[in-house]
């Protein structure tokens, strides 16, 4: 399907959550962060969050999209405001690329990317989300482009150490519709 006339494009920064009810393309750039996409195939609405960390100890503070659990809660609230339920959405997970693999090998700590991946998968399980695709882990960064008019999510993954022309051959569409 061609890009509809009047399509809006939104670029998410780390910690942002966006939800749209009209033809929209959502974009973001991920390293160790993770993006969760929600797409409602009947209503052609949905959203994306770009979280940075698995969670925080918070008490009586506003929700903050920088944290996995809170970013998902914000998406769930958008779904509810639009008269839909989480079970009606196709959900996809992206990111969690290890950005400093050599450093990680020398230190006995876990990297943020792995913690983010585990948080995303645990939240998907806890909320019984309908996961249709995921592209997480490895090294390097990913450019994500999510088209709400058809649910396609395009991923360009640039692993650490790959030549630029090799990375372009790895472009893929995370269909799963």
UniProtKB/Swiss-Prot annotation:
Pfam families: CheD. GO terms for biological process: chemotaxis. One of its GO terms (molecular function) is protein-glutamine glutaminase activity. It catalyses: L-glutaminyl-[protein] + H2O = L-glutamyl-[protein] + NH4(+). The keyword Hydrolase applies. The keyword Hydrolase applies. Keywords: Chemotaxis, Hydrolase. Gene3D superfamilies: 3.30.1330.200. It is an enzyme of class 3 (hydrolase). Its EC number is 3.5.1.44. Probably deamidates glutamine residues to glutamate on methyl-accepting chemotaxis receptors (MCPs), playing an important role in chemotaxis. Belongs to the CheD family. This is Probable chemoreceptor glutamine deamidase CheD.
């Amino acid at each position: 399907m061609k890009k509809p006339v009047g399509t809006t494009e939104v670029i998410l920064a780390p910690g942002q959550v966006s939800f749209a009810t009209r033809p929209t393309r959502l974009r973001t750039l991920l390293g160790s962060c993770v993006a969760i996409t929600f797409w409602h195939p009947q209503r052609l609405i949905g959203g994306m969050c770009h979280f940075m960390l698995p969670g925080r100890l918070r008490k009586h503070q506003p929700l903050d999209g920088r944290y996995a659990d809170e970013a998902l809660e914000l998406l769930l609230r958008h779904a509810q405001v639009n008269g839909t339920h989480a079970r009606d959405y196709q959900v996809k997970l992206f990111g969690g690329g290890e950005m400093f693999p050599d450093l990680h090998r020398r230190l006995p700590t876990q990297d943020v990317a792995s913690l983010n991946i585990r948080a995303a998968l645990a939240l998907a399980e806890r909320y019984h989300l309908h996961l249709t695709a995921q592209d997480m882990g490895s090294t390097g960064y990913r450019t994500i482009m999510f088209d709400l008019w058809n649910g396609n999510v395009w991923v360009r993954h640039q692993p650490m150490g790959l030549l630029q022309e090799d990375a372009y051959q790895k472009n893929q569409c995370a269909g799963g519709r």
